[in-house]
């Protein structure tokens, strides 16, 4: 493996990626570009080895399945600076580099007396990845608190600042997901309130708070409740390879949901993000099809949570993908519902 090091960036050849994805599958990058200073990005991207190559951005690799070696160059941002850049009477603007660990940012915001991100505690990944999927959990989504996304626009070869509206944030969606070849996120600014109405819609959070003796909850209490719940339900990717929830919860027209409930009266249904749509529980669908806790070789579904696909050791990305496809097919055959993966599939088509 040969390396090229310049001010603010480093380029490595034939770099192993097992440590850079939370499924811990084996894959190799033809080129791995590590950027420490975003200002150096245009120069780094112009390096002759990668100038015309496809580009894959990896944060902590917590939302990808490497079903094969990625083509071209893998880019990792190593800028991990976090700071409050503006104080106001009732809120503050926090800026975090793309390489900052997401959970570390949540804890930082709470330490600064800021709220809003507490329901999103312990989600794996980096700040740079959070707007792409508009990450969400327990009734909250990050898009509600994004002020500005700072990115490098590859089409116009310039740095840009996109406000929340320009980011086109939707359910697990954004302009960055819709145009993956255009924007490289280098930092995110968050508008975080000093006091925020706590999101306690999920019964599990209320029950956890009660068990903690925190009926009059603060944001930090909600974060701890979420941490407790996630640690019980979701395997630690450092111990057992996984990418958290593998499938999206399906959004369907209310008419289709009513028809399903006529046949499956115990099917749980939740409000959708838009009028006329409801949301089904992908975990419930998968469990009803008998996949929860099932294992084939080193590929399997967590016995604690039916949404979590796991690598018990040496499963390849291709094996995990095949396993996931068969789960989705069984749900389609039984319920006529299409499951879509949350992680980005690299090296193969879904």
UniProtKB/Swiss-Prot annotation:
Single GO biological process annotation from the record: cell division
Pathway assignment: Cell wall biogenesis; peptidoglycan biosynthesis
Reactions this protein catalyses: UDP-N-acetyl-alpha-D-muramate + NADP(+) = UDP-N-acetyl-3-O-(1-carboxyvinyl)-alpha-D-glucosamine + NADPH + H(+)
One Pfam family cited in the UniProt record for this chain: MurB_C
E.C. number(s) listed in UniProt: 1.3.1.98
Top class in the EC scheme: oxidoreductase
Stored InterPro entries: FAD-bd_PCMH, FAD-bd_PCMH-like_sf, FAD-bd_PCMH_sub1, FAD-bd_PCMH_sub2, MurB, MurB_C, MurB_C_sf, Oxid_FAD_bind_N
Cofactor(s) named in the record: FAD
GO molecular function: FAD binding; UDP-N-acetylmuramate dehydrogenase activity
Active-site residues, record numbering mapped to chain: 172, 245 (proton donor), 342
Keyword Cell cycle part of the UniProt annotation: yes
GO cellular component annotations of the record: cytosol
Source superkingdom: Bacteria
Function: Cell wall formation.
Family: Belongs to the MurB family.
Entry protein name: UDP-N-acetylenolpyruvoylglucosamine reductase
Organism encoding this protein: Xanthomonas oryzae pv. oryzae (strain PXO99A)
Gene designation per UniProt: murB
């Amino acid at each position: 493996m040969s390396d090229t090091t310049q001010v603010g960036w480093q380029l490595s050849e034939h770099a192993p990626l097992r440590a850079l994805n939370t499924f811990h599958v084996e894959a190799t990058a033809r080129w791995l570009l590590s950027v420490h200073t975003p200002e150096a990005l245009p120069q780094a991207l112009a390096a002759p080895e990668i100038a015309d190559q496809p580009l894959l951005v990896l944060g902590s690799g917590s939302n990808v399945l490497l079903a094969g070696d990625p083509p071209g160059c893998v880019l990792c941002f190593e800028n991990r600076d976090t700071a409050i850049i503006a104080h106001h009477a009732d809120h503050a603007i926090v800026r975090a580099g793309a390489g900052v660990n997401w959970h570390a940012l949540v804890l930082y915001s709470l330490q600064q007396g800021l709220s809003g991100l507490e329901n999103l505690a312990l989600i794996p990944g980096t700040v740079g990845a959070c707007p792409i999927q508009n990450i969400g959990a327990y009734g909250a989504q990050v898009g509600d608190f994004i002020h500005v996304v700072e990115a490098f626009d590859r089409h116009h070869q310039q740095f840009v600042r996109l406000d929340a509206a320009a980011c086109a944030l939707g359910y697990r969606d954004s302009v960055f997901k819709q145009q993956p070849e255009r924007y490289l996120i280098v930092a995110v600014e968050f508008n975080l309130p000093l006091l925020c109405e706590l999101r306690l819609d999920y019964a599990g959070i209320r029950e956890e708070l009660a068990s903690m003796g925190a009926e009059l909850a603060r944001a930090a209490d909600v974060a701890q409740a979420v941490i407790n719940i996630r640690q019980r339900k979701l395997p630690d990717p450092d111990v057992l390879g996984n990418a958290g929830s593998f499938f999206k919860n399906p959004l369907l027209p209310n008419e289709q949901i009513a028809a399903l409930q006529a046949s499956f009266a115990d099917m749980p249904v939740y409000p959708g993000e838009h009028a006329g749509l409801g949301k089904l529980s992908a975990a419930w669908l998968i469990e009803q099809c008998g996949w929860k806790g099932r294992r084939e070789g080193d590929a399997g579904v967590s016995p604690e949570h039916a949404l979590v696909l796991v690598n018990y050791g040496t499963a390849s990305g291709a094996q995990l993908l095949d396993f996931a496809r068969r789960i989705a097919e069984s749900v389609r055959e039984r319920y006529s519902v299409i499951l879509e993966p949350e992680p980005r599939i690299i090296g193969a088509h879904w």
